[in-house]
């Protein structure tokens, strides 16, 4: 029903105020307010005056152009979320991600993303920090003409990266390095979740179960430290790590290029002094439970555990042979 009809019914005594308001789908208070406007200005009085007023919060052309030029001058090719992070942290921008995305898309600098399908049900995070950590690696062209492995150790409860560094190829040494950095910074944790790479587990049959009795050097070290080792049996099981690497592959090459970094040493310094802390600030979430499952490492020498152990037989001359060398004891 149109307002005029309801107004005439009410003013003619055929409808009560409550009935007229109900027919219009509004409360009595709104109906009374509209009656006052209608009596004063007619139908024009019923129009929402806000529609003809410029919002005080609306960005002006100068601000829009500044964002566009900032993106063009130093961030061309960056995804919107990555640029928005720098826009807020480095340029003290106050606009929302959606606003920045709309501006860049309007300028033809960002693509409109395709609608995503229904998301799968996520695995629940560990409720307490230090209960479960992930360790994984991603092979990628992080700088021009260079393919490295990025090794990340991450807390499942919060997503905090406890260690991340580049190396030529992941393996036993890189696993030890990531574990050593994590334990030195936070302490011993309860369990490690990893893929079934040959440096983590021995797998007698391709695609089969891992051998929990014959341990790799990483497995031996974890057992010695009292850390449970959990094997992932599908890429989907490592989804949290995979999504983190998608973020790193979309951001790190641009950040390293912007900083003029082309060497592994320089890239690792950037990870340690700049990138890891910034990533943790932006992406970490609060754990379900307060407190921590980390405990201090106080027994023995950590480097003596996080290294390869090889058994050798001592000869009659008190020497052992190792990789073609004769070592005197």
Name these PLM-found stretches.
Residues 29-32, 98:
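Key DNA-contact positions within bacterial/archaeal DNA-binding proteins
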Residues 62, 93-94, 105-160, 168-189, ...:
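Mobile-element integrase/transposase regions
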Residues 18-24, 83, 87:
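Short alpha-helical "recognition helix" segments of helix-turn-helix
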């Amino acid at each position: 029903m149109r307002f005029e009809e309801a107004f005439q019914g009410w003013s003619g005594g055929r409808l009560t105020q409550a009935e007229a308001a109900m027919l219009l789908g509004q409360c009595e208070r709104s109906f009374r307010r509209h009656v006052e406007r209608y009596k004063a200005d007619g139908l024009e009085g019923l129009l929402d005056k806000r529609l003809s007023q410029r919002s005080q919060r609306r960005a002006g052309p100068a601000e829009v152009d500044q964002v566009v030029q900032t993106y063009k001058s130093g961030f061309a090719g960056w995804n919107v979320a990555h640029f928005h992070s720098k826009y807020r942290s480095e340029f003290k921008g106050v606009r929302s991600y959606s606003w920045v995305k709309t501006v860049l898309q309007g300028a033809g600098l960002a693509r409109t993303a395709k609608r995503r399908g229904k998301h799968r049900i996520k695995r629940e995070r560990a409720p307490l920090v230090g209960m479960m950590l992930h360790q994984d690696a991603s092979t990628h062209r992080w700088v021009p003409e260079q393919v490295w492995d990025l090794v990340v150790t991450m807390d499942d409860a919060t997503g905090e990266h406890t260690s991340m560094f580049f190396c030529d190829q992941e393996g036993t040494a890189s696993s030890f390095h990531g574990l050593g950095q994590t334990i030195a910074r936070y302490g011993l944790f309860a369990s490690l979740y990893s893929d079934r790479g040959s440096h983590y587990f021995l797998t007698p049959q391709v695609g089969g179960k891992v051998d929990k009795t014959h341990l790799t050097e990483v497995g031996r070290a974890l057992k010695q430290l009292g850390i449970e080792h959990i094997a992932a049996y599908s890429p989907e099981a490592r989804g949290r790590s995979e999504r983190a690497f998608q973020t790193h592959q979309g951001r790190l090459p641009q950040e390293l290029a912007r900083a003029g970094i082309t060497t592994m040493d320089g890239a690792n310094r950037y990870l340690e002094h700049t990138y890891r802390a910034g990533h943790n600030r932006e992406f970490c979430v609060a754990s379900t439970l307060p407190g921590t499952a980390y405990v201090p490492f106080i027994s023995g020498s950590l480097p003596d555990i996080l290294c390869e152990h090889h058994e050798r037989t001592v000869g009659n001359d008190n020497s052992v042979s190792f990789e073609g060398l004769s070592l005197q004891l």
